[in-house]
């Protein structure tokens, strides 16, 4: 369903590369996407191993393309391009070694137009999935930072949380960009974004540098994206509970019904999405790099 959202979005996603081609969850997803004609799928791995894993799980991957990074006919061009992108930080030999790993290979495949997006993290750590993208794919025009958000799903309900993975202690201006880009991502996944700029304070009820940072960022967001529904600084309970919102933030178009949550730093964000996932029954999808 999340992949379907991407295909129907303005991002024009048509082909997706999966870095862990033998993982059961990946193969199940590839089977469904290709059988339903939703998306073209590229699976990375040794063909015999990928096919054996698919057969063991009774998944039909006949419509998928399988690429072995260690036996790719276009590897020389890929090496040359990656050496150029790394600007002297890696030798030819180091680049070839990196590209033998599916996380780097998949990222370069996207960079060179062989796929529109990459999905990884089934067995790779978040750091190992994100690092190649940070090194090889630059920010889009107008963006100053790379950030991230998670989409959390529970039944038919979807919410977004950012930045849970990249920026440790974002500045006011960083928070502005994180909020605006997270809202855009939320919209892609079918969420009508109502953005809560989270804090331990609601509209001046508390004091401190973090409160000031979030409050100032909220003002800047309203100036930069006046069409975006945003409230802050605001406590979490006031952002989701209509009863609390009526007391702490009356008349707000966001308070009590927020669905896109921007945290003041990575400590709060990472803890927050994991609490939602482990105790709240949400499935976390991400991090989506913005």
Q: Which sequence ranges carry the predicted segments?
A:
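Gly/Ser/Thr-rich active-site loops/lids in small-molecule metabolic enzymes
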Residues: 137-152, 181, 185, 210-233, ...
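N-terminal glycine-rich phosphate/adenylate-binding segment common to multiple enzyme folds
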Residues: 74-144
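Single conserved hydrophobic/aromatic residue that forms the stacking wall/gate
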Residues: 1-8, 13
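Short, glycine-rich nucleotide/cofactor-binding loops
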Residues: 14-25, 165-176, 205
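A structural-propensity feature for long, helix-poor, extended segments
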Residues: 150-174
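Active-site rim loops that border cofactor/substrate pockets in soluble metabolic enzymes
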Residues: 84-86, 91-104, 108-109, 164, ...
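Histidine-anchored nucleotide/phosphate-binding helix
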Residues: 23-47, 181-185
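Terminal amphipathic helices with adjacent charged low-complexity linkers/tails
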Residues: 34-70
